[in-house]
Amino acid sequence: MSLRDKIEHAIQNQPCTVKDLKARFGGDRGADRKVMEALDALVHEAVVCQRSGVFFTVRSGRAEKALLCKVVKLGKNFAFVMLEDETSDIFIPGRFTRGAMPGDEVLVEKFEHPRVEGSDEGAILAVLTEKNDLVGTARRIEGRLKFVPDDCPAISMQLMRDCEGGAKDGDKVAVEILMRGSRQEDHRVGVAMRFGSSDEAKRCAKALLYARDIHTRFPDKVREEAKKFEGMTVSEEDCKGRMDLRALPIFTIDSAETKDIDDAISLTRTPEGGFELGVHIADVSNYVKPGSELNEEAFNRATSVYYADQVVPMLPKSLSNGICSLNEKELRLAFSCLMRLDKDGNLTDYRFVKSVICSRVKGVYAEINALLAGTADAEIQAKYAEVADQLPAMKELYAHRARLRTERGCIDFESGEVKLILDEDGHCIDVKKRTSGESEAMIEEFMLLANQCAAHFARVKQIPFVYRVHEEPNGEKLERLHALLQACGINDHFAKEVPTPKELSAILEGVRGTAFEQIVNTGMLRCMSKACYEEKPKGHYGQVLKDYAHFTSPIRRYPDLAIHRIMTDLLSGTDKETMAIRYTDFAIQASKQSSEREVIAVQIERKAEDCYKAEYARRHLGECYEGIISGVTQRGLFIELENGVEGFVPASSLTPTGTMLTEGIRLSDPVSGKNWNLGDSMMITIVRADVNLGKIDFEVAPEAKQ
């Protein structure tokens, strides 16, 4: 039996201290060193772990109710770990982190805080699975090039001299941990990839994609499979067995930049004065088949990722911009939802059919808005001549649907989205609030109708499916919203019971046009549960719908592609029993994967946007702007400028005498009596902008201090 095995066996029988082990297996300096080497190996391999200076096997640690967790946040002197079931997190003091990094799977002992009654802390007993790839910045510190991880900018790690990979001070890099120490600062890393300067948002965005395993390049097998779709057209043979809708004046409406066009629309009046609305969706499932490399990659990606002027598509361009995209004047295969509505806009019937269509024109939101408003010039009018006679009926139908939305109490949040203006080198030179007109709202409502029909179809047919689920907000979030509303002088009962969507909608309407509009809108949005995908229908709280799914974007969302495939199979005559066997597990897996990847995509898009905003702010250092206090914390104020750029004013820069926080809505200087209230306007100066971290610092403008 080797020394390593002997030590493991001894600890398994009886937890031991280092002194015990040296006394039993050591004796001199050389033997003691071998004991420590064997013990270190056992700890590193997560066979043995330590608690309070006593070593015991991981198996016995589990027996003592140790918890399996994942490190989710790391600070200079602390960490947070998430339980395996993701129900709650645990605070880990710095002395108990054992050098663990974000993403590591760890074994944790939970215990009561020694000084705060009722508060729990934890200690990491062992690192079970190491996540050794990190993204951050190369920084020259104390004469040496070191690595500062994005996940914990307060920590720096040694870059091994022969593994610097040509990195320079300030470069955005990905590294691999080559040697782990007992503390995070003791880890040794080597550069795996250089992205370029961390002062450029486009480089930081590339690093964000890399960190979350989102690849801009498709695998060779996928690209090879996609080649057969290059230049492909729809033949008459392809059209057989489909409803021929080529005679309908179908058209698309998107932004001017859109190249992956999922959806098209048509509208006719019925003899009774009602409407027949057609929502025609790209039939991606006709090309992306189960078992193909394309399908496996689409499942893994689950969504396209959009940021600035870039897109990382779910499908290769030969499909996303080619044969699947409903391009103008090109024959395309579609999956159509044909809906009948009465003269008041109520849905009375629908059917789903496989179809062949030809879009008459690539519509642009701004141009359609001009037509609807009667301000379009002759050139725009000529462009839409084939489809323009549908627009008055579409406007009328949308007015009916908007009224019905209001009656059922749908919550309509202001999006707060911004448009990033880039120069020819990809640098952000301007930021503007994104505006939305009547055509955007109209298309959104028509797509929502088709999504509702798809979910209703599946629920009635009782087939496996991927539903879009939005549950009611939980108690803790509602308590925070209640406090915010009370601080704004708005009475509510939300601390005691869950509000209806109609009640929330009424509050939003009540603050419209006031100083609290943006703050209440943001606070209410944050209190909402996250929408996700599930295999069971649970309804949609925000839309106030019993049935909801995502049917209308199969080029960029896998759930849509998944339900197209399921619905196609049922419409072709497959019986319910076969459907259950074929798709039950698939619906569960697609729901889980799509929910997880959507969260990651949204995080990347938001972080990338922050980097671009900071890049814009760097161009305006020292300049003064008026903003609104959008957040109040003990540390200071968050200020949002008119264009949607947000920065932070530290409390220490407001007054030298210290501040007091009142319920998250006010900072006060008890000496001067000055208050800074949520919703107040404030003149600020941009003083710092960290593109790498996407953070902007403001100070109160000199004239505002007087």
Model regions and ranges:
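Charge-lined substrate channels and their catalytic hotspots, especially those that engage the 3′ end
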Residues: 1-278, 285-330, 366-370, 615, ...
